[in-house]
Amino acid sequence: LEVLGVENVEFKTENEKPCIVSIHKNGTLNNAASNLDVLLTNMILEEEDKVIFPEGEYTLPMTLPLDKSITIQGTGQDKTIIKGAILVNGSANNTATDVKIKGLSIDYTPTKVTSGKCTPIIEVTGNADLLIDNCIMNNNTQGYGDRKNPNPAEALQNAILLGATAKGTVRVENTTINLAANAQSGVLIDGELTDVSLVNTKIDGQVNGSNQFGVYIHHKKTPVTVDSTTILLNNHYCIYANNAGDQKLTIKNKSNIVGYGALYLYETSDMNVHVSGGSILTGKTKNKGVSDSFAAIAISTNNSTVGASNNEIVIEDSYIGNKFDEQETMAMTPIKINGSFTPTPCDNKIILKGKTIVSTTDNIKNPTIVGYGMNPD
């Protein structure tokens, strides 16, 4: 039976239960079922198919692999809830698969592991162009990966993991990522992609704890854009470039970045950062502590041979400052450069342009705009 033009047709079972529908790119029906297990068992997805989920809650029996150009469409981020994880397994050649995930919530509580990685909500491998639009991602885990592993792909539980083999582009738009526990990141970039963009998106980690990250850049060359986006963390680093560099980071259009280090370049060199368009970068006390102090922007090394040099940070028509949630007991500089280890960071440029404001705390008589000192913890 060939059914044409079914995208706006509502399919129901005999008991009036709405069906999940799979549609081919030419508009014909692939399959429909009210039960996700039944649909996955009997459905063979083809290139450019669209799978439409009606309102409801659906539990994936296992990680859902997407190895073709596929669209997963819900009826709204507050109406369609998927519980489980998704693997976007892109192509191994130069032609990227085109994957879209739109209009739904993804709740995931992975199992704690002691070795290997803790399964991310969405993982990308291979060459894929991924769009996540109008979604909510709830990173509910209370477990961790292998916390002693120096690779954050395995040490952290990542909402979105762009793996070591990931290529192509990733765009996260009109989406909220909620971090609910320690040792989590919103987006971890561990591969070399053409572009990673967050647009009108929010990463919210306002819980006490440690080792949370908004955007964690762990690979060189991938350009990253943070556009009209809010990142709010109670601890650690909103945008953290660790052993990255030779790339462009753009923060623009009234993005609001607030955490224990809004931007931290750690053992990262040759990075070009441009903050513009009324954006705000705020350093604050960790977990509302009275003596934890850091900075809005930091550059540092940790006694390694990697270094942190030749970075250029341009701040244009934007705000850089500090915020204390509780009583202030320590001085806190808006911009901090660690000069305590060899090799000392050198040849870094910080350029203020336009109507930029750099603010310190009110009760310091001779505030320091740029501080040199020990590595932050």
Question: Which residue stretches match the model-derived regions?
Answer:
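Acidic/polar low-complexity surface segments
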Residues: 109-115, 140-156, 206-210, 283-294, ...
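Solenoidal tandem-repeat scaffolds enriched in leucines and small polar residues
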Residues: 142-161, 166-168, 172-218
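Right-handed parallel beta-helix/beta-spiral solenoid domain characteristic of secreted/periplasmic
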Residues: 70-121, 134, 139-146
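N-terminal extracellular ligand-recognition/capping segment immediately after the signal peptide
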Residues: 27, 48-71, 77-85, 235, ...
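Intrinsically disordered, low-complexity segments enriched in Gly and acidic/Ser/Thr residues
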Residues: 268, 290-345
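Acidic Gly/Asp/Thr-rich repetitive segments characteristic of extracellular carbohydrate-active
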Residues: 3-54, 59
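Structural detector of coil-to-beta-strand junctions
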Residues: 85, 112-123, 143, 157-161, ...
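Solvent-exposed loop/turn tips at the surfaces of repeat/solenoid architectures
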Residues: 6, 56, 75, 85, ...
